């Protein structure tokens, strides 16, 4: 380490953050908007599968990113980089400093789990902590909106939310703590844009059965409430969806569903089945899907 690097290490401020995945406990596509996006109604729940981030304020201006996944872009194509740039552009406290982001990817990419959006939202929250909470939660959510539909949820402190608009208008909900979830990912990247374009071809008026928040006193009916409008379309493109659902059902899941635009499927298990049963099911599924099986809980 040369002298300049040594001086930088002494003045840099670091923060470790965990960026959680999410599952969609319901997702209904309501209509297509004039801007090409779709209005949604979705119940999002953060779960205990995390990307790991380290944020470092540096003397050198700009944003740099290193990542454990060599397939992840390191420039402004990455939402985490764009989030950092958005924060720096708004901040009056950062001065001429820049940001270095170290990202360890554990959440599968293109999986319907919100990994990239979570990284971006977590960068906003982390930089805000490093800079002594310069912005309110509401201001962070507003900053997150141009970055992507799910980013406001991850920029918030909400563990669960009912989201409308394009997914950026949030109503906080209590976490679904009485269930365990097993996530299974087939290792197939699904383009959210492509799925919504295909869905628009089949969009027809429908009753908004699922377009409402799921309330605490209704938890007994959660399993009936689960629904994903996009699942049928993704299943046609990715037959593994139905296969994963069948395996989860055969191994005791109370309900199974695809998360977001796929390709991850999750099974819901009553907490009362116990960790031993969860571990057994994960072992069975891992024989086919390897390291893409995750036992998680609501956070």
UniProtKB/Swiss-Prot annotation:
Q: Kindly tell me the pathway this chain contributes to.
A: Isoprenoid biosynthesis; isopentenyl diphosphate biosynthesis via DXP pathway; isopentenyl diphosphate from 1-deoxy-D-xylulose 5-phosphate: step 3/6
Domain of life, per UniProt, equals: Bacteria
Record-linked InterPro entries: GHMP_kinase_C_dom, GHMP_kinase_C_sf, GHMP_kinase_N_dom, IspE, Ribosomal_Su5_D2-typ_SF, Ribsml_uS5_D2-typ_fold_subgr
Against Gene3D superfamilies, the record matches this protein to:
3.30.230.10, GHMP kinase, C-terminal domain (3.30.70.890)
Q: Which residues are annotated as active site?
A: 22, 150
Note whether Transmembrane occurs among the keywords. Answer: no
Q: Which reaction does it catalyse?
A: 4-CDP-2-C-methyl-D-erythritol + ATP = 4-CDP-2-C-methyl-D-erythritol 2-phosphate + ADP + H(+)
Q: Name one Pfam family in it.
A: GHMP_kinases_C
Kindly list the GO molecular function terms attached to this UniProt entry. Answer: 4-(cytidine 5'-diphospho)-2-C-methyl-D-erythritol kinase activity; ATP binding
What are the record keywords, sorted? ATP-binding, Isoprene biosynthesis, Kinase, Nucleotide-binding, Transferase
Which Gene Ontology BP annotations are present? isopentenyl diphosphate biosynthetic process, methylerythritol 4-phosphate pathway; terpenoid biosynthetic process
Binding residue positions for ATP:
108-118
Q: What EC numbers are recorded for this enzyme? A: 2.7.1.148
The answer on whether this UniProt entry bears the keyword ATP-binding reads yes
Q: What does this protein do?
A: Catalyzes the phosphorylation of the position 2 hydroxy group of 4-diphosphocytidyl-2C-methyl-D-erythritol.
Q: Which family does it belong to?
A: Belongs to the GHMP kinase family. IspE subfamily.
PANTHER family in alphabetical order: 4-DIPHOSPHOCYTIDYL-2-C-METHYL-D-ERYTHRITOL KINASE, CHLOROPLASTIC
Query: What name is this protein filed under?
Result: 4-diphosphocytidyl-2-C-methyl-D-erythritol kinase
Classification from the root reads: Bacteria, Pseudomonadati, Thermodesulfobacteriota, Desulfobulbia, Desulfobulbales
Tell me what gene encodes this. ispE
